[in-house]
Amino acid sequence: MGGVKDKFLVKGGARLQGSVRVDGAKNSVLKLMAAALLAEGTTTLTNCPEILDVPLMRDVLVGLGCEVEIDGHTVTIHTPAELKSDADFPAVTQFRASVCVLGPLTARCGRAVVSLPGGDAIGSRPLDMHQSGLEQLGATTRTQHGAVVAEADKLVGAEISLDFPSVGATENILMASVMAEGQTTLDNAAREPEIVDLCRMLRSMGADIEGEGSPKITINGVEKLHPTSHEVIGDRIVAGTWAFAAAMTRGDVTVGGIAPRYLHLPLEKLKLAGAQVDTFENGFRVVMNKRPKSTDYQTLPFPGFPTDLQPMAIGLNAIADGVAVVTENVFESRFRFVDEMQRLGADTSVDGHHVVIRGIEELSSTTVWSSDIRAGAGLVIAALCAEGTTEVRDVFHIDRGYPNFVENLQALGADIQRVVA
């Protein structure tokens, strides 16, 4: 992991070939670390990714009174009998996932103060559904001085229906309700594999949960949870990024460490674009021997096409044969990436939450800036398809979500270097 001012120099033209294995999911490990707050004792997480956000979450947990050790891919969390309830220190504001301590703290302490989180600049992501869910469980919530405050003498099960299948709200409500009195039903719950992973861990801690992976989750509250050991699910977004990188560079890449069913729609889309895709139990292979065909995409909550792979869909269509439309239905400001693609020569136009991409034969090199984790990765892969050498700046965003990104690309044959500022 590098510094804030590091940049990448990416020379285009290489055909990616070889194999790569994905680590545990960023969108899972941070929530699992928060779930460790629910039980006094030592919880161990394995297959953790070596990304910037894991030490940031460690700092959040340490600020709440935990002891946390990171040893390569293993994170060990020692949760005390008495937690601090106020997560209103600088580490909390640095990344979005810090808000997932709201539910566990309310459940354990009867009170939580969580600073409004930072993270990627990809649109408004309000906490209304998080707060509403806690209120339906019996808490009072308010926003004051840049923080969410939740208080509850006790939490009581409720029938909760989400307006939108928000991943973050589903996670916070799950963690708040596992020790609530009585039964909670959560309708229109998020169905993402990372939700299933969280429920698996909570169940191994003694929680009574049914229905994860479906739109309705039922939680029967228990009096107490116990610590556990848990292996983090593989990162489907990183795996999907490698899949698109193979297709865009007309490469041949085998990706391991991920169940291909978690990427069913992205892999089907790559087939439509002309790629050969072979799947096996714990991975897949993508081979592309020709220029991709333009393919329309629309992002939706799982099992739809993931918004986190939207930059890769735009990048693929930028060099494809034909015209395509990519529609963003999840985050309204995620097309900032398009401005940077235009610097690379992409022929695009934005209309509301649609972007029209007219494919060209080859992109051109320039200097571009990452605005978030996935946009940064998308720009690097697009630069691999450009003539000449592209400078990618603000790559600290990429370090937040992609372990050993440069090293993995180099192993696949890419000409990429990190320049340390």
Curated annotation (Swiss-Prot):
GO molecular function, one term: UDP-N-acetylglucosamine 1-carboxyvinyltransferase activity
One of the record's GO cellular component terms: cytoplasm
Reactions catalysed according to its record: phosphoenolpyruvate + UDP-N-acetyl-alpha-D-glucosamine = UDP-N-acetyl-3-O-(1-carboxyvinyl)-alpha-D-glucosamine + phosphate
Keyword ATP-binding applies: no
GO BP term, pick one: peptidoglycan biosynthetic process
Origin superkingdom: Bacteria
Keyword terms, alphabetized: Cell cycle, Cell division, Cell shape, Cell wall biogenesis/degradation, Cytoplasm, Peptidoglycan synthesis, Transferase
Binding-site residues for phosphoenolpyruvate, renumbered to this chain: 26-27
Localization of this protein: Cytoplasm
InterPro entries recorded: Enolpyruvate_Tfrase_dom, Enolpyruvate_Tfrase_sf, MurA_subfamily, RNA3'P_cycl/enolpyr_Trfase_a/b, UDP_GlcNAc_COvinyl_MurA
Pfam families: EPSP_synthase
Family in the record: Belongs to the EPSP synthase family. MurA subfamily.
Protein name: UDP-N-acetylglucosamine 1-carboxyvinyltransferase
Gene assigned in the entry: murA
